[in-house]
Amino acid sequence: MLALTSIVSLIYAEDDGLAFLTSALIAFAVGGALHTAGSKKEGKRMTRADSFLIVALTWVLFSAIGMMPFILHLRMSPADAFFEAMSGFTTTGATIIADVDGLTYGLRFWRSMMHWIGGLGIIVFSVALIPVYEMKNSNVY
């Protein structure tokens, strides 16, 4: 998604494309390292607690990677950039950016993608919980 956002920046001839490409390379490196470290071991089964831990850590990891363009291009502090990314991936909609309309098209696209991915993640997480806890649909909403 970060690489796709750099294409948006390229189309609009904006100067934030390098921030997205750098972030994409960092994400690729982290993903490769986690894939190598988490290769399936024989005889190991994932427990319910492991599943919840993975979901929670994934949200934190997505936010840590998602904050990179804000740090690299807008020179935001890490705390502000993490807040902005976590807000997007949890779909809370809160922002600390005073002029969202003044952002580049690439950053606006990235913010939109974070909210979309976050919304999709919450739906998938909810659907995954229903069978585990044998909930009825009326108990979810």
Q: Which residues does each predicted region cover?
A:
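Membrane-proximal intracellular helices of multi-pass ion channels
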Residues: M1-Y141
